[in-house]
């Protein structure tokens, strides 16, 4: 292949990498996959908090691999796929132990009065709500299913295709010094 064409392809892939890395990162800020909003959380553990962002590990894990003529975006976190695609998780004994641990952790953080009653301040009320959530989860039957809604942050969409098409058109126009338009079928 002509070296100029190889350089142009490399430049196109580099431009796509930069643009799509930014766009996929912005999905976490938008709390949507481009224009497709993510389902709100039901869990009271972080009310009003960002969806899919707790420590930011999932957001930072999005990477890409580039070859001579392709680019692939991916994440290697084990829980990324269930969030991106949605699905159901079977409750296990180990999960129930974890839920009980979180319940006791939340109840142990209650602010208490001298007589031992929980305070009625905002933080204690928030923790009581959180504790109830963890108790509800811990009391689920082993083998029952927890539904995880689909919250895509990576993938192909009309917005991705449009951005890629524009990048290709810009680079070809620059290379040939001629207006170029890729029509979608």
Question: Where are the language model's segments positioned?
Answer:
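Short, Lys/Arg-rich flexible segments
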Residues: 1-185
């Amino acid at each position: 292949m002509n070296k100029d064409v190889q350089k142009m392809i490399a430049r196109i892939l580099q431009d796509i990498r930069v643009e799509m890395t930014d766009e996929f990162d912005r999905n976490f800020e938008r709390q949507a996959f481009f224009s497709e909003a993510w389902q709100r959380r039901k869990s009271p553990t972080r009310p009003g908090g960002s969806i899919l962002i707790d420590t930011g590990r999932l957001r930072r894990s999005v990477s890409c691999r580039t070859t001579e003529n392709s680019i692939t975006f991916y994440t290697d976190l084990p829980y990324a796929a269930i969030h991106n695609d949605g699905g159901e998780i079977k409750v296990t004994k180990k999960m129930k132990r974890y839920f009980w641990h979180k319940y006791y952790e939340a109840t142990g953080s209650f602010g208490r009065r001298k007589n031992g009653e929980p305070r009625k301040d905002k933080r204690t009320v928030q923790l009581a709500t959180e504790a109830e959530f963890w108790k509800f989860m811990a009391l689920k039957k082993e083998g029952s299913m927890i539904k995880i809604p689909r919250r895509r942050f990576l993938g192909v969409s009309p917005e991705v295709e449009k951005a890629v098409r524009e990048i290709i058109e810009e680079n070809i126009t620059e290379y040939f010094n001629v207006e170029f338009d890729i029509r979608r079928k």
